[in-house]
């Protein structure tokens, strides 16, 4: 798959002005970079910060927007009632809320469109949030112009934006089983545990939680970092300080969606 950069720039020029729903991920970062290049001061970004949003994503989004000198609105929201018990359609509910807020920002600044960073190899069957895109009339120029995730990484490298490339993240709700109450303190200790493990070179990593037990999923190339008695004792002790009673390592390593296996 090969994204058409010229077509993307033409499409952005046609749109005239926009607000980018900006997660800080590589895809939306590349889109924001291109939009800034084509539209200049007629582009802005909005990032929604909920209790289940990773703070590292918020920091990353703010840094990129600042580097591009793009006006950037952070919208801090409480946990929506519809997400309190982590329903199976959580992605749709979250995206619908996020895009509605982005539309409000677009209306406030007089921008004609809301854009997001969906790419051509995002599987619609696995991305229920894509339903919200259609309902909220959000446009996905990278998708329209055939950009895959690999294309985005290639373009970021060509632009000298290597620092914007990182392991894919997902919100903290994905660390919890479906249909169980979301507790703020549990989200906090999950994020603290992941930040600790990332600081030790474990990337990607997910800390799945059932309330009292942390199940660590490490990238397959990182699993070897755990296999020493001293290292395992240190990790277990630190995660217990964060509030977990039990700590385990998933020997199969990181795999998306495994919390519901």
What do the predicted segments below correspond to?
Residues 1-158, 199, 214, 230, ...:
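ATP-dependent adenylation/nucleotidyltransferase module used to activate substrates
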Residues 119, 176, 252:
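Flexible loop residues that form catalytic
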Residues 143, 147-149, 153-197, 204-205:
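Mid-to-C-terminal catalytic subdomains of enzymes
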Residues 167, 209-213, 251:
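Short Gly/Ser/Thr- and Asp/Glu-enriched loop/turn motifs at secondary-structure junctions
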Residues 199-215:
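Short edge beta-strands and adjacent turn/loop segments
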Residues 205, 224-234:
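C-terminal, charge/polar-rich interaction regions
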Residues 211, 215-228:
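A short interface-forming secondary-structure element
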Residues 257-261:
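Short, low-order "capping/linker" segments at domain edges
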């Amino acid at each position: 798959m090969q994204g058409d950069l010229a077509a993307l720039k033409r499409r952005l020029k046609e749109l005239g002005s926009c607000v980018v729903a900006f997660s800080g991920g590589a895809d939306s970062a590349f889109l924001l970079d291109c939009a800034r290049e084509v539209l200049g001061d007629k582009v802005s970004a909005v990032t929604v910060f909920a209790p289940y949003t990773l703070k590292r994503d918020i920091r990353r989004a703010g840094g990129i927007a600042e580097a591009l000198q793009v006006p950037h609105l952070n919208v801090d929201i409480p946990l929506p009632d519809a997400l309190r018990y982590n329903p199976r359609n959580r992605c749709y509910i979250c995206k619908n809320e996020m895009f509605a807020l982005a539309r409000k920002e677009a209306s406030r600044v007089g921008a004609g469109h809301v854009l997001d960073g969906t790419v051509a190899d995002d599987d619609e069957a696995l991305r229920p949030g894509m339903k919200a895109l259609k309902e909220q009339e959000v446009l996905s120029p990278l998708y329209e112009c055939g950009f895959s995730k690999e294309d985005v990484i290639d373009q970021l490298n060509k632009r000298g934006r290597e620092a914007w490339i990182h392991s894919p993240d997902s919100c903290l709700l994905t660390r919890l089983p479906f249909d169980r109450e979301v507790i703020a303190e549990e989200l906090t200790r999950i994020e603290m545990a992941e930040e600790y493990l990332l600081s030790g070179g474990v990337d990607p990593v997910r800390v799945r939680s059932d309330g009292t037990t942390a199940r660590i999923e490490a990238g397959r190339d990182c699993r070897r970092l755990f296999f020493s008695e001293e290292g395992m004792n240190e990790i277990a002790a630190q995660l217990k300080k964060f509030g977990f009673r039990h700590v385990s390592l998933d020997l199969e390593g990181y795999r998306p969606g495994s919390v519901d296996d």
